[in-house]
């Protein structure tokens, strides 16, 4: 009986901690940096090329402008 009560209290405590962390995460304030390590991994895997770098698609370039004929990232939107 005592073990059951301890387990129930532990589960309730862990649930409350998760809800508090989720609320903090959703408002933009962050108390626990390790919880957002997945965001950091996503940003590191999505690198872009500076103007003059090579590209095959617009999202390869930081400015989102790719001259596909020359396969070069542009600094500004191309003039048509």
UniProtKB/Swiss-Prot annotation:
Disulfide bonds, paired cysteine numbers: 48-62, 55-66, 61-73
Superkingdom of origin: Eukaryota
Protein name, as recorded: Conotoxin Bt6.5
Biological source species: Conus betulinus
GO cellular component: extracellular region
Domain notes: The presence of a 'disulfide through disulfide knot' structurally defines this protein as a knottin.
Keyword terms, alphabetized: Cleavage on pair of basic residues, Disulfide bond, Knottin, Neurotoxin, Secreted, Signal, Toxin
Biological role stated in the UniProt entry: When injected intracranially in mice, induces a series of symptoms such as quivering, climbing, scratching, barrel rolling and paralysis of limbs. Unexpectedly, no effect is observed on ionic currents when tested on locust DUM neuron.
